[in-house]
Amino acid sequence: MTIDITEIMDLIPHRYPFLLVDKVVEIDPNKSITGIKNVTVNEPQFTGHFPARPVMPGVLMVEAMAQLAAILVAKSLGSTKNKEVFLMAIENSKFRKVVQPGDTMHIHATIDQQRANVWKFSSTVKVDGEMAAESKFTAMIKDKS
């Protein structure tokens, strides 16, 4: 099952310039999800990171992983219209390959553990089949107030 950008925008609140998932290419609710982010030179972070050699900031790769996980949460719960997903912890992040405009980030997230409203994930970013980044993180799902 694929999810296009229109449905992604229904599932998570992020918008340009901070929406970092372009498409979901595979999802197994309550288990895992795979999506893509096409990295383009038009993105605002590249005006300063770095002008002579644009490089995707590692923190934005982690954010893309977290956004993909939030989509997985929404699909696993059936909806997050009345819920908010908050990042609680980021652990063991590693950056192994430079990601630059023209690259396609293949992002994968897996649910490692789910206890009540706290979910733990493992996630990776690959470019051209090579590991670019990996991280583990924890999120809390809360009712909207």
Swiss-Prot record:
Keyword Metal-binding belongs to the record: no
HAMAP family per record: FabZ
Name the UniProt record assigns to this protein: 3-hydroxyacyl-[acyl-carrier-protein] dehydratase FabZ
Keyword list, A-Z: Cytoplasm, Lipid A biosynthesis, Lipid biosynthesis, Lipid metabolism, Lyase
Pfam short name (any one): FabA
Organism encoding this protein: Rickettsia bellii (strain RML369-C)
Enzyme class at the top of the EC tree: lyase
Broad class of where this protein is predominantly found: cytoplasm
Originating gene: fabZ
Reactions catalysed according to its record: a (3R)-hydroxyacyl-[ACP] = a (2E)-enoyl-[ACP] + H2O
One of the record's GO molecular function terms: (3R)-hydroxyacyl-[acyl-carrier-protein] dehydratase activity
Location within or outside the cell: Cytoplasm
